[in-house]
Amino acid sequence: MLMNRKAKTVNVLEGPMTESCAEFPARHVFIKCPECRRVIDEARLHDNLEVCPRCGKHFRVSGRARMRMTVDEGTFEEWDANLASEDFLSFPGYADKLKSVSERSGERDAVVCGRGKICGCDTALFFMDANFMMGSMGSVVGEKICRAFERATELGLPVVGFTVSGGARMQEGVTSLMQMAKISAAVRRHSEAGGLYITVLTDPTTGGVTASFAMEGDIILAEPDALTAFAGPRVIEQNMHKRLPKGFQRSEFLLEHGFCDAVVPRGEIALTVGELLALHEGHAPGLGAPHEIVHTGRRGKKLGHLFKRSAAPKTALEIVKQTRSADRATAGEMISLGLDGFVELHGDRYFGDDAAVVAGIGWKDGRPVTVIAIERGTTTKERMRRNFGMAHPEGYRKARRLMRQAEKFGRPVLCLVDTSGAFCGIGAEERGQGEAIAQNLMEMSGLKTPIVSVVTGEGGSGGALALSVADRILMLSSSAYSVVSPEACASILWKDTERANEAAEALKLTAPDLLALGIIDGIVDDRG
């Protein structure tokens, strides 16, 4: 039996034909942040300087990318661009490794050196590159950085260096190791010529680079959460057979332990470095306040405004008690009032950063000055953090480090002293409290730059003297300066603390008393 089928019909389009391109949505590449595990648009990450906009994780960037982020556009002149590593030891696989890494990264070796401007300040620069064998230091890296320092010394330029490295390049044997000493010698010559060296530690900075030029800067900055270590975490864990605590050897760990001056987010590094370069050129920066370490002064007020919180004392003991008042003006308030700006620097480079001693570079009417101040704090929480103004050995060593810097760069030093005395405790003795004070006395007595010390509150014994060996010693009219507190004097000599008032009068600890004795050079009226 035959089946009927429907005839197929064909639709025919009549009229002229036109072509049109189909529109597809733009392609986006997404990256997962290893820290917060969130997905980020690659373009957004790039616009944010390769920093996760959600958690602040700083991704690694190439040396040239970092150069573009930091240097004023159109000002960079590269030095020694044609130097390239060779396999001079015939190390197995090294020649092929150099070729493949060079093709992939577009670089001849792991550092880019040159000259450029940061916020208008002329400087020599080097940028290490983790994309080339993890920034390992071989003979070419050493030679290029060494030449950069030598040129900077000849030209009278500061040096700003960005470090990233897995350490020495093993494929070049002891030649790689020798670069540590070679660069360090060049850094020393540059420093002796009065040159400023700023290092910026980025993730990771380890091994021989950490144990040489990375930690030799006059000022050391670090990106957040950057691993900085001599021995890496894996090496230590294998050695110790235990897990390391979270944050160990990271930037914040370095800051807490006194080995860097500040942790600065990537987006603020250029402006922060520009501020520091301007200050070392001998003029005040006019760039604003890029980072919390820069504080703008309050203008138009007089010192007396800070000291009219309580009635004028009548006796020596009342003066002493008033210096201890929580309402009394702090060093931070005086710095904010008296200076146009202030950049705080941290750390003694040995053990820690003592919050009781605030130190850094300030400027007034365009002129830079090194400021070292003992800070008691105001609130209970802050006073505890600052140990009630009783400095540890690391506080005095931080002060000495900043004094030496001031001498090197020809800045005057201003010390603001307000302490009941140096901290007495087991840890302070273990870390050499007496030695720290003694070294300060010797250092200040021969410092070849002007020093002015002002006793702004209580000047307690050796802890105060450690910042009071100066060309000019001043006291605020409501301050006190003594070998011992009146209460301790009465207790020790007379076994009677009720005689503290008598002891205060006998100790001659007021500003007029000490001026009459020739101990101080002048009195500053703090009552306006």
Q: Model-derived features: where do they sit?
A:
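Glycine-rich anion-binding loops of enzyme active sites
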Residues: 206-213, 229, 463
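Catalytic-face loop-and-helix region of soluble metabolic enzyme cores
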Residues: 239-240
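Active-site pocket-lining/capping segments in soluble small-molecule metabolic enzymes
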Residues: 224-226, 233
